Amino acid sequence: MFEINPVKNRIQDLSDRTAVLRGYLDYDAKKERLEEVNAELEQPDVWNEPERAQALGKERSSLEEIVTTIDQLDQGMDDVTGLLELAIEADDEETFNEAVAELDILDGKLGQLEFRRMFSGEYDSANCYLDLQAGSGGTEAQDWASMLLRMYLRWAEAKGFKTEIIEESDGDVAGLKSATIKIIGDYAFGWLRTETGVHRLVRKSPFDSGGRRHTSFSSAFVYPEVDDDIDIEINPADLRIDVYRASGAGGQHVNKTESAVRITHIPTNIVTQCQNDRSQHKNKDQAMKQLKAKLYEFEMQKKNADKQMLEDNKSDIGWGSQIRSYVLDDSRIKDLRTGVETRNTQAVLDGDLDKFIEASLKAGL
């Protein structure tokens, strides 16, 4: 005799998850809009305006992905329920297995739609930059910044992303004052965008001869790589461009010349820097690309009332804007936004971040 209840529970779970997505993705409004778009595309004169026709075609594809998938899920769950009833009546294991197989397919489709829900932002599919900045705590904070860099590099490697270290500024004694890395791969920004914020470390400091407990802070800021054709106006008069000798890993080849470049956008006080190439010209181009991306994110955050502005995220590297607390002596890491925590601190510092990231994405942060 086959197990009926687990399958019934799965059907209920799929039904509940589909209902949540139907509301979140505003299925009714999208279905109505899809009908309107289809009607417009059927008009004989639609291609008199090619750009509008292309935009409508793109909108239709996006709407169909949601509407069709939810329709298929609704119909599929009705079909599976019917197959399960037949299997029970006829005591037919083959029909039962067919119902389970259909359920697996539906689960996969729903998972793809849930993925879309998490990554629905305009630039979620883009590559991204990650800036790390040591804050309160001196050498301890600078060592913490280097630990965070290692953590994110390990995470990116495990996810199959490529990384480039754009800039590293060594700490006074150990660690890093700042670093910028580029993460390359599908949905890199989508995965990392909720990591922006202040990360707090509490531990017995290896730099304290008395072995006392120290609290230190470092900030992370994530922003997407933007297309070159995005129109972001930058007035050259608003820029201060400094050149300096590179430091940090990889800087040994360029230390003899001032090839590293730092660009400050004076109106916003946004700073970008690059030192990963021997050519000052190439470093300047890369720093300008980062500046363009940061300014774009700055404008997007200003427009979104539900997000903190860039100035808030960057200003107070201290208690005010923490997202996660890493208390190593107590073996406890806790996300202060979602409440997710773990005692496997070493795994997290080795890059096992998905538990935290997925919770923040599902919470819509």
Curated annotation (Swiss-Prot):
Q: Give the record's keywords alphabetically.
A: Cytoplasm, Methylation, Protein biosynthesis
What are the GO cellular component annotations? cytoplasm
Instruction: Tell me the domain of life.
Output: Bacteria
Cite the SUPFAM superfamilies for this sequence.
Answer: Release factor
Q: Which Pfam families does the entry mention?
A: PCRF, RF-1
Q: Which InterPro entries match?
A: PCRF, Pep_chain_release_fac_I, Pep_chain_release_fac_I_sf, PrfB
Post-translational note: Methylated by PrmC. Methylation increases the termination efficiency of RF2.
Extract one GO molecular function annotation from the record: translation release factor activity, codon specific
Intracellular or extracellular location(s)? Cytoplasm
Coiled coil (UniProt feature): none
Q: What is its main location?
A: cytoplasm
Where N5-methylglutamine occurs, the residues are Q252
One GO BP: viral translational frameshifting
HAMAP family (alphabetical): Rel_fac_2
Misc remark? The gene for this protein contains a UGA in-frame termination codon after Leu-25; a naturally occurring frameshift enables complete translation of RF-2. This provides a mechanism for the protein to regulate its own production.
Matching entries from NCBIfam families are given as:
prfB (TIGR00020)
Function, as annotated, reads: Peptide chain release factor 2 directs the termination of translation in response to the peptide chain termination codons UGA and UAA.
Family that this chain belongs to: Belongs to the prokaryotic/mitochondrial release factor family.
* Name of the protein in question: Peptide chain release factor 2
Per UniProt, what is the name of the gene that codes for the protein in this document? Answer: prfB
